[in-house]
């Protein structure tokens, strides 16, 4: 994931968490808010409830990979908060959950909306 597509500063995370819409899934919670940029930026929060450092990093890698294969509409700041089971699932399961959350928020790009509706 490119540096320009990531949320990096505390203020960016705080803005999304405070004013973003909340979408709840089995493996993750997503908060999203429109931004005024030509691109979408994504951040990840994985607490110690998920497990030790190895499990937390695995959960982030799975979330990142799920987003890499999923197209997003431009102009959104998105934060994914991993739930405790996130480190134990296969990438395909996480991808299904991520597509479902993005579809609920209407952030999924047009090309991926059709494949998301078939998965649910």
UniProtKB/Swiss-Prot annotation:
User: Coiled-coil annotation: which residues?
Assistant: none
InterPro entries (alphabetical): Ribosomal_Su5_D2-typ_SF, Ribsml_uS5_D2-typ_fold_subgr, RNase_P, RNase_P_CS
The protein's Enzyme Commission number: 3.1.26.5
Q: Which GO terms describe its cellular component?
A: ribonuclease P complex
Q: Which domain of life is it from?
A: Bacteria
What is the role of the protein in this entry?
RNaseP catalyzes the removal of the 5'-leader sequence from pre-tRNA to produce the mature 5'-terminus. It can also cleave other RNA substrates such as 4.5S RNA. The protein component plays an auxiliary but essential role in vivo by binding to the 5'-leader sequence and broadening the substrate specificity of the ribozyme.
Q: How does it assemble?
A: Consists of a catalytic RNA component (M1 or rnpB) and a protein subunit.
Please give the name of this protein. Ribonuclease P protein component
What is the taxonomic lineage of the source species?
Answer: Bacteria, Bacillati, Chloroflexota, Dehalococcoidia, Dehalococcoidales
């Amino acid at each position: 994931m490119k540096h320009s597509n990531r949320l990096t500063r505390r203020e960016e995370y705080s803005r999304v968490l405070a004013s973003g819409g909340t979408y709840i899934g089995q493996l993750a919670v997503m908060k999203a808010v429109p931004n005024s940029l030509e691109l979408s930026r994504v951040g990840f929060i994985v607490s110690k409830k998920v497990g030790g450092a190895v499990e937390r990093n695995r959960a982030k890698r799975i979330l990142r990979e799920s987003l890499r294969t999923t197209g997003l509409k431009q102009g959104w700041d998105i934060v994914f908060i991993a739930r405790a089971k996130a480190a134990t699932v296969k990438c395909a399961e996480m991808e299904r959950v991520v597509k479902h959350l993005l579809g609920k928020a209407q952030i999924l790009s047009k090309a991926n909306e059709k494949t998301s509706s078939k998965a649910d």
